[in-house]
Design a protein with these regions (language model features):
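Hydrophobic, well-structured mid-protein blocks that either form specific transmembrane helices
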Residues: 70-112
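Acidic, serine/threonine-rich low-complexity disordered tracts
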Residues: 1-88, 118-205
Length: 205
């Protein structure tokens, strides 16, 4: 695995340049499985009232670099969302039981998480919150030097967007992602949806 030796990635979640929470990934090797756990927690407050919040726990398992298991539980504004995904060897597909999709998925789908550089090669991404599958188009914008916590990194700047015009505006997505090939890390993600959002690397070990 490209992530041998990596123990954790911590990212701040910002909205309109203000830190409102975090998303943290923890990596472990369990015999022949590579296991990634994620904890995400953030909330947007307006005049002291929480108007939007996410509290999420996920676990994904890989065998020989291939996804075999994914499970997530999320509270979005107190509404529960979930995904249970398993690789079914007999049909060579993923079987998903999610809050917004139940059924099969082909193996060219990648979970839409911000630790995994496979997202740049994927034609479809699975929502880690609800299990929905969306086709995506990935474009390389170019090489850019960016500053993260006072340190300069050379990155590849990608744009990832949903390419199904029939999706409602609410379900469409477009992300800009800055990836550092040297240490295989996604350093920064930005998008606009009711504000300017940014996921930014805080630390890794």
């Amino acid at each position: 695995s490209h992530y041998e030796g990596l123990k954790k990635i911590e990212m701040d979640v910002l909205r309109n340049n203000e830190v409102i929470g975090s998303t943290n990934y923890f990596f472990e090797f369990d015999e022949d499985l590579f296991v990634v756990k994620n904890y995400t927690n953030f909330k947007v407050e307006l005049f002291g009232i929480t108007v939007f919040s996410i509290l999420s726990e996920t676990i994904e398992k890989y065998k020989d670099d291939k996804l075999v298991f994914f499970k997530s539980n999320t509270f979005q504004n107190d509404k529960e969302k979930y995904v249970n995904l398993n690789y079914d060897k007999s049909i060579n597909k993923f079987v998903i039981d999610g809050s917004s999709y139940k059924g099969e998925a082909s193996l060219d789908c990648t979970i839409g998480n911000w630790w995994n550089h496979k997202i740049f090669k994927a034609e479809k991404q699975i929502s880690p919150l609800s299990g929905s599958i969306k086709k995506q188009t990935v474009s390389l914008i170019g090489n850019e030097n960016i500053d993260i916590n006072g340190k300069e990194y050379l990155t590849k700047h990608f744009n990832i967007k949903s390419n199904d015009e029939n999706l409602s505006d609410e379900k469409k997505f477009e992300f800009d992602v800055w990836y550092n090939p040297e240490n295989n890390l996604i350093l920064k993600v930005t998008y606009n949806k009711m504000g300017n959002w940014e996921y930014r690397l805080r630390s890794f070990e």
